[in-house]
Amino acid sequence: MGQVNLVRIGRNYLNAGGSFTLTTGILADHPVMLTTSPAMVNGAIHSFVKAASLELVNGIRINVVSSGLVEDAVEKYEAYFPGHNPIPMKKVINGYVKSVEGKGTGEIIRMYDNC
């Protein structure tokens, strides 16, 4: 609930035209073994972003960047994501740039290839 609470409280302090960028991962769309709870949370955040974007005022935007397994973490996490194609960190960074500097709201910015 940390990211949700950040938006719930932060919207009262964010300047008009500001934005929130939340973070999730590939598990919302492509869960793997033993990830039921994380997959559920990722999917819930996706739905929260879509709904909250309809209710935020003063031009405040909200998006979520959802990343696949990042190349930098392959050594540590590859066993948990069999058959997944690692994503270059630059691609993930560009997702955040798109969210912060773009004009979209309510977007799930998926930064992963077809697993």
Positions of PLM-derived features:
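Catalytic loop of short-chain dehydrogenase/reductase
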Residues: 1-6, 11-57, 66-69
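C-terminal helical subdomain
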Residues: 57-60, 64, 70-115
